[in-house]
Structure formats: C-alpha cells, structure tokens
A protein has these predicted regions:
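Histidine-rich, glycine-flanked metal-binding segment
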Residues: 40-42, 47-53, 62, 67-107, ...
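Acidic, glycine-enriched loop/beta-strand segments at the rims
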Residues: 43-47, 62-75, 88-89, 401-406, ...
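Metal-associated gating/positioning segment near the N- to mid-region
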Residues: 104-185, 189-191, 207, 308
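Active-site gating loops and adjacent loop-to-helix segments of metal-dependent hydrolytic enzymes
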Residues: 119-148, 207-224, 259-272, 328-357, ...
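Histidine/acidic-residue-rich catalytic or RNA/ligand-binding cores of hydrolases
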Residues: 121-124, 180, 209-211, 261-263, ...
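Divalent metal-dependent hydrolysis catalytic cores, especially in the metallo-beta-lactamase
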Residues: 153-179, 194-203, 248-259, 291, ...
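Histidine/acidic residue-rich metal-binding segments in metalloenzymes
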Residues: 182, 233-255, 260-334, 355-373, ...
Length: 466
C-alpha cells in the first residue's frame, strides 16, 4: 500500500501555508451558524514554543469538567506547552505575558472523537454540501488523487482546530490510505499547524453484497467505501498487522454496512464480520497496542462488536435492549454521531418514511437514560469541518445538561481515547490547550458555536475576544 503521496502533499503545503488565504466557510443553512473562523484556510507553521516562555491567562470564569461547575477569577500559568499552576491564588511570574480573558469563559480544549479529515468540502457555500462530489471512497482517491485529498485533510484539520477542537480522532480515510498518519506526523513534528491527532487508516471491511472490491493502482484490495477488504480470522489478523506497520493508532472496522427500512418502519442492518472474525481483529489490534472502533448501526453486527470487546462501538443508530445490556455489562462507551446522519434525512424520509437521523435521536436518548458513556463524536466530513461545535446544542436538545454536553468533549472523550493524563481538563501538568467564549455556556449552550479564543500547547491559534 502506498502512503508517500501524502508526504509529498504535506511538503508542498509548507511553502504555501503563509500565502494561501480564502474566504471562511459558511455553515449550511440547515444548521445553526458558528462564529466566523479565521480567513486563512491554511495556518502558518506553528512557532516553536520556548520551554522558558511563560504565559498567565486571567479567566473571569473557568469551566471545570471534573465537577461540571464554573469557577471564577482563575489564573492559569503556562510555561512552554504545559500548565504549571491554576487557581484563584496562582501567582503570575515576573515577566510573564498576561492574556486577559477576565470577561470570558475559559475551558479545556475540545475533543472530537470521531471525524474524517480527508472527507469534506472546504469550499462549501451557503446551503452547499459538505462533500465535494467524488472525494470519498475509492472513487475519490482515484478521481482527485491522494495529494489533493491530503490538502483537503490539512485544511479540514486546521478548521477543526480553529473551531476549538485541539484534539481529534480520525476514524477512517475513505480511500485516503494512510494520509492521516502523515498528517499527524507532520503536525507532531511542527511542519504544519493542526490539532493533536489519533488516526485510523483505510479501515477494514469483509466482503459482502454492499461492497464490490476492486484494485487500486498498487493492486491492493479496497472496497467501494474506501476500506481494506479482509476475510476470515487469519485474513483480518493480517490486515491489522499491515495497518499497524503503517503507523495507525486505531483500527476501524465495518461490522454493518448495508441497511434499509422495512415498510413497517423497522430498520434492517446486515452484519459483515462474524463474531469469530471480530474477536480476531480485537485480539490482534490489542496485541499490537492499538484501539478498535467499529461502525455498527445495530443488530447482530453491533452485538458482535460489543461481545468481542472493541474499545469504542460507534453510531448505534438502531440500539436495541440487548445492545444496551451488553454495553453496560462490558462497560463500553457508545459514540453517537449526529450531524453526519442529518445530511441525508430528507431523502431517506422521502424514500422510506423514516431515517437514520430520526432513529439516532431515539437511540441516543435510550443510551443516555441507561447511563452508557457517550463521548463527543461528530462524524464531520459529510458536513463542513469546524462547524461541529453546533452539535453541543443538539446534545442538550436530546437530553444532556449543558455541563454533560461539555464534559462529553472534555473529560469523557479524553478518557475514551486514553489521553486523560494529557488533555481534557485545565490542570497542572497537562497540555495548555484552552478555548474561550464570551458568555456562559451553562446558561446558553449555543455559546459553544461562538468560540473566540483557541490555544494549543501554549500557542495562541486565534484570539477574537474583545
């Protein structure tokens, strides 16, 4: 499998980063508007943060996700890329740069635990689609080329960062092979600006009637959704080892793929992998030190995921009682993406009389009522990156308190991705990843759609606080 094409694109971007500027994207009319993001779509490479650099942030209000409450008149002291002190009595060191957010609400940087940076249309106009036609799956990889999609990935990742998502998890490249591995490495090495990233590669799917495998230029099998095809316990183990070799953090599998709605309104989800195959994937991934996320809408495919012990089942559009019981027994979370499903609501209702979006609302509320852990995951890609902050309002609309909605993208998500000792709270020793809004998000959750300040690792990404 090829992955060097992604690095070629990254290298080209270094010289373009400081001169490329285009209008900010505008949210689809179907969604609430978000605060205007910076004009430059490609941010300049990050300045090297000196270990001796000292910053003091005066926070008029600070959300503490550990307690779900607002603290007042806090001082956050930052040295280099880490927080060294925080509290009402924290001393501001002599010579420190002081950032005045005394009229704002400061929070930990946000975490989106499920999105796709190689998907999505950064050129979206008002009311336009999130996806550029032909940019996803194997067709997209062939039509546009991996280099072009790497450019899309960088722009999308930077829009996520500018919107406040200082940490993201990319769960499948949809035909982009290992481009996200290269992007993650380029960000970590300081070549380009971007959020902290954990990434999956092309994903793995079993042969089934919903996908027809065909070769790319390098003759590696790939499904029509842009995933690697593997079958049988030995075959899936080999696929996991191969993806581990290329440097992924996660293995993404499709436990269901084809779905439809019956005339009586029930949802039918066809499983792909058997339980034995799913167990082999999980066993091999964990042996390689990788986490596993499974795409599963419901039924047998979702049951197999949970029973096999994947780290994060995703979607759960048609969540039955058996799945709820299994999730609780296994103490597993469920990432319920929302906005990605909303994009096709109208056409699905026209075709079937119902939709995944409508099923998702019921299933989300069911999982929440049962006490299943629900990290923030947007599925960004089918809709424009950087606009998923609007999902906070839906979390509240669907039953979460504002504090719970915020926690889902902070402490909850940090725990799920295994970075709870690095991000997710404003604490001594953690990365200096901060966001701020003008108002009180506990009183008005739509404040999250108006992020005004973003800091990642002690470096200010944007500051629009008046």
């Amino acid at each position: 499998m090829r992955r060097r094409d992604g690095l070629t694109a990254i290298a080209a971007l270094i010289s373009l980063a400081t001169i490329l500027a285009v209008p900010a994207i505008v949210r689809s009319q179907a969604q609430p508007a978000v605060a205007a993001l910076p004009q430059a779509w490609v941010l300049p490479p990050p300045a090297q943060v000196s270990p001796a650099q000292t910053i003091a942030v005066r926070a008029g209000r600070m959300f503490d996700p550990r307690t779900g409450t607002l603290l007042t008149n806090q001082v956050i002291v930052i040295r280099g890329d880490r927080i060294t002190d925080v509290g009402p009595n924290a001393q501001i060191p002599a010579g420190a740069r002081v950032i005045d957010l005394s009229r704002a609400t400061v929070m930990p940087g946000l975490i989106d635990s499920h999105l796709h940076v190689m998907d999505g249309n950064p050129l979206t106009a008002p009311g336009g689609p999130g996806i550029i036609p032909g940019t996803t799956g194997a067709a997209g990889a062939n039509t546009l080329g991996l280099q072009y999609r790497e450019l899309i990935a960088l722009v999308n990742a930077q829009r996520d960062l500018s919107a406040g998502f200082t940490t993201i998890v990319d769960l499948m490249t949809h035909g982009g092979w290992y481009g996200t591995v290269d992007l993650r490495n380029a960000i970590n090495n300081g070549l380009v600006q971007g959020p902290r990233m954990q990434v999956a590669g092309p994903g793995i799917v079993a042969t089934n009637k919903a996908n027809i495998a065909f070769p790319l230029i390098n003759e590696s099998p790939i499904a029509n959704l842009g995933a690697q095809v593997a079958n049988g316990p030995d075959g899936v183990r080999a696929a996991v080892r191969e993806q581990a070799h290329y440097g992924v953090d996660w293995i993404k599998i499709y436990s269901t793929q084809e779905f439809h709605f019956e005339p009586n309104g029930t949802m039918v989800n066809t499983p792909t992998f058997t339980l034995e195959e799913t167990q082999a994937i999980v066993s091999e991934a964990h042996r390689q030190g990788l986490k596993v996320a499974c795409h599963a809408y419901g039924g047998e495919g979702l049951h197999n995921c949970i029973q096999a012990g994947v780290d994060v089942p995703t979607h759960g559009v048609d969540l039955d009682d058996a799945s709820v019981k299994l999730l609780l027994e296994k103490k597993l979370p469920l990432t319920s993406t929302m906005f990605d499903l909303s994009m096709e609501d109208a056409q699905e209702v026209k075709r079937w009389g119902t939709s995944r979006w409508r099923f998702m609302e019921k299933s989300f509320k069911k999982a929440s009522a049962a006490g299943i852990v629900q990290p923030f995951g947007s599925g960004a890609g089918p809709f424009p990156h950087g606009t998923q902050v609007d999902q906070f309002a839906y979390l509240v609309k669907w039953g979460k308190t504002p504090a719970q909605a915020l926690q889902s993208a902070m402490t909850v998500a940090a725990q799920i991705i295994g970075w709870q000792d690095q991000v997710g709270t404003v604490e001594k020793g953690k990365f200096a990843d901060l966001v701020a809004v003008a108002g009180d998000p506990l009183a008005d959750i739509t404040e999250m759609s108006r992020i005004l300040f973003v800091m990642k690792g002690g470096q200010i990404v944007r500051n629009d606080v008046k």
